[in-house]
Amino acid sequence: MPRIIGIDIPAKKKLKISLTYIYGIGSARSDEIIKKLKLDPEARASELTEEEVGRLNSLLQSEYTVEGDLRRRVQSDIKRLIAIHSYRGQRHRLSLPVRGQRTKTNSRTRKGKRKTVAGKKK
């Protein structure tokens, strides 16, 4: 298993897929990185040489925000929204959907398990 910026990527998968195991790198960015470094996208991650792994590490550290830095940035952005009392910040604070989805039904993932309320007495 090659270790890239502190993450073990799967050795048996193709390089394009293996890179997506790093937080902040999806399919499109993986293609972009492979083209920049002129690597073979069909090659397995285990076939990378030490020199290629080194180039990959240096590129990811210098040009991209990934893993811990990206997670911290997302968290700080959410904290900032909450601090300035924006609508999106309030939705985050109340654990409700942020992007305009309906909440009368659905949104169970965001709200959590149902809180049962006693019915009306007759």
From Swiss-Prot:
The keyword Oxidoreductase does not apply. The gene is rpsM. Belongs to the universal ribosomal protein uS13 family. Pfam families: Ribosomal_S13 (PF00416). GO terms for cellular component: cytosol; small ribosomal subunit. Keywords: Ribonucleoprotein, Ribosomal protein, RNA-binding, rRNA-binding, tRNA-binding. InterPro entries: Rbsml_uS13_C (IPR027437), Ribosomal_uS13 (IPR001892), Ribosomal_uS13-like_H2TH (IPR010979), Ribosomal_uS13_bac-type (IPR019980), Ribosomal_uS13_CS (IPR018269). One of its GO terms (biological process) is translation. Residues 101-122 have a biased composition (Basic residues). This is Small ribosomal subunit protein uS13. Part of the 30S ribosomal subunit. Forms a loose heterodimer with protein S19. Forms two bridges to the 50S subunit in the 70S ribosome. It comes from Chlamydia pneumoniae (Chlamydophila pneumoniae). Residues 93-122 are annotated as: Disordered. Located at the top of the head of the 30S subunit, it contacts several helices of the 16S rRNA. In the 70S ribosome it contacts the 23S rRNA (bridge B1a) and protein L5 of the 50S subunit (bridge B1b), connecting the 2 subunits; these bridges are implicated in subunit movement. Contacts the tRNAs in the A and P-sites. NCBIfam families: uS13_bact. GO terms for molecular function: rRNA binding; structural constituent of ribosome; tRNA binding. It comes from the Bacteria.
